[in-house]
Amino acid sequence: VNARRITPAAYLEELKARGIPALRVGRSAVMLESPLPVKDIPGFSEGIVSVQDAGTQLAAEILAPQKNEQILDACAAPGGKTAHLLESADCHVTALEIDPKRAELIKSTLLRLRVEATVRAADAAMVSEWHSGREFDAILLDAPCTASGIVRRQPDVPWSRRPEDPARLAREQERLLNALWPLVKK
């Protein structure tokens, strides 16, 4: 639920009035008892709500952004975590995505939700190409991984992986962490 637009309690009332059973999950989420196509979820196209896994939503809650903080969301596409950070506090987020098409996806997500961030298509590890020199209060890095955590939703994931993927992805994660760690305020 986009906290800048509606409370979870008010959204639950709206769903109830439409005959859509749902329940509150955590501090800011609502779960429909039966799935609906995204286009049929009340308020989705208007930016009132987003669709996210419960685990994904925890990223913003754990980071707990504060007013005026500078936050970097690296490897940010499709923009759900970026948006959730911005919905949680009046903070400033820089969202990086290496793929320009996926960076555009972040922009469209933020536009739909009526929140603003600085979105850049850049390799997060190539700091000199995108960084202004300002330190960040926090960094959210959802580094490329084997996607083993989404097998429940996408059972074909194990079949699309190669034996060398874990080692290759671990090197990429290390490269990103080593590049970004120095940008956090001491």
Provide a role label for each language-model segment.
Residues V1-K186:
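S-adenosylmethionine
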